[in-house]
Curated annotation (Swiss-Prot):
Protein name: Aminomethyltransferase
Encoding gene, per UniProt annotation: gcvT
InterPro entries noted in UniProt: GCS_T, GCS_T_bac, GCST_C, GCV_T_N, GcvT/YgfZ/DmdA, GcvT/YgfZ_C, TrmE/GcvT_dom1
Lineage of origin: Bacteria, Pseudomonadati, Pseudomonadota, Gammaproteobacteria, Alteromonadales
One Pfam family it belongs to: GCV_T_C
Organism: Alteromonas mediterranea (strain DSM 17117 / CIP 110805 / LMG 28347 / Deep ecotype)
Gene3D superfamilies, sorted: Aminomethyltransferase beta-barrel domains (3.30.70.1400), Aminomethyltransferase fragment (4.10.1250.10), Probable tRNA modification gtpase trme, domain 1 (3.30.1360.120)
Length: 359
């Protein structure tokens, strides 16, 4: 029996094509994945992300616990509501999951972790909490809706009360604020501006309907994947997992090495990997016909690699991919497509931001 979100009925009403997503019955699209993709790049789209796991970490040692748990350092978070992105690593330096953490104060934080890894993550959070004065509470009573695109904030704001409008006024990217019954964050997984909004589950349907009435287009997991790949954002389980170092997943920027005395889970292994050198995650661009896909082999001058994520980019009109390759890769590589080797260009793993190509 698959799990459903508080918005399941709304998806069916809208004629969504539903698929099983790690035990959740979720919309893959509502008719046209390409149209949904363009709506987010050009106007405003919304995603049901209620399957994500919301976890509150509170207690006298909440900060110390998260400093030990995460490769990125929550000590950087000084302002109320400021968020950061981090990997949660195992002792071998592999990625248990990637997540966002919001800082309310040094005794109160909120994490948003992936749904596919929920059980594993909860067990990991609990096991690492031993010896720390913290309580870890999952918050399934919230639904979560991501409203993304150049007009997303403006359209979402038509639903906000005066106090909520005031709370988000001038809010910079990567912040979250509790404003009356909504938790509103300037985060997302598309490379566009917008909000991720946590709403009490019993209000989710009416909130979704009000967004529809404001002209926000519902979008499924299909468009979510092409948007995040254009933005060069990793998908857990594909671009990295427990066997992959963040250094080999374009996540080096999420590791806080200083102060050297901060011990975090996986630090020793990471230091050895940094010393020895690892593979790296790069972007690939192919302007010929055909689509680069996950799992395709990549040949470079310094050895073999593999495509971790690949798709047709609706914004650019050709195929893009992310690939893990030896670190001294050249400007081009070869990819095996339909039994022949095709030369493709190597770029930084980011293709589109705020509706524009960054290639």
């Amino acid at each position: 029996m698959s799990s459903t979100t508080a918005l399941h009925t709304k998806h069916l009403e809208a004629g969504a094509k539903m698929v099983d997503f790690f035990g959740w019955d979720m919309p893959i699209n509502y008719g046209s994945q390409i149209e949904e993709h363009h709506a987010v790049r050009q106007d405003a789209g919304m995603f049901d992300v209620s399957h994500m796991t919301i976890v509150d970490v509170k207690g006298a040692q909440a900060k110390a616990y998260l400093q030990y748990l995460l490769a990125n350092d929550v000590a950087k978070l000084k302002d109320k509501g400021k968020a950061l992105y981090s990997g949660m690593l195992n002792e071998e330096g592999g990625v248990v999951d990637d997540l966002i953490v919001y800082h309310f104060d040094e005794t109160n934080y909120r994490l948003v972790v992936n749904s596919a890894t929920r059980e594993k993550d909860m067990n990991w959070l609990m096991s690492k909490a031993e010896g720390f004065d913290v309580t870890i509470t999952e918050r399934p009573e919230f639904a979560m809706i991501a409203v993304q695109g150049p007009n997303a904030k403006e359209k979402a704001a038509t639903l906000f009360s005066a106090a909520q409008k005031e709370a988000v006024a001038g809010m910079k990217p990567f912040f979250g604020v509790q404003a009356e019954d909504l938790f509103i964050a300037t985060t997302g997984y598309t490379g566009e501006a917008g909000y991720e909004i946590m709403v009490p589950a019993e209000q989710a349907e009416s909130f979704w309907q009000a967004l529809l009435d404001a002209g926000v287009k519902p979008c499924g997991l299909g468009a979510r994947d092409t948007l995040r790949l254009e933005a060069g954002m990793n998908l857990y389980g594909q671009d990295m997992d427990e066997t992959v170092s963040p250094l080999a997943a374009n996540m080096g920027w999420t590791i806080t090495w200083e102060p050297a005395e901060r011990d975090f889970v996986g630090r020793k292994a990471l230091e050895a990997q940094r010393e020895a050198g690892t593979d790296k995650l790069v972007g690939l661009v192919m302007t010929e016909k055909g689509v680069l896909r996950h799992g395709l082999k990549v040949k470079t001058e310094s050895g073999e690699g593999v495509i971790t994520s690949g798709t047709f980019s609706p914004t650019l009109g050709h195929s893009i991919a992310m690939a893990r390759v030896p670190r001294d890769v050249g400007e081009t590589v070869e990819v095996e497509m339909r039994k022949k080797w095709v030369t493709v260009k190597v770029v930084k793993p980011s293709f589109v931001r705020n509706g524009k190509s960054v290639l």
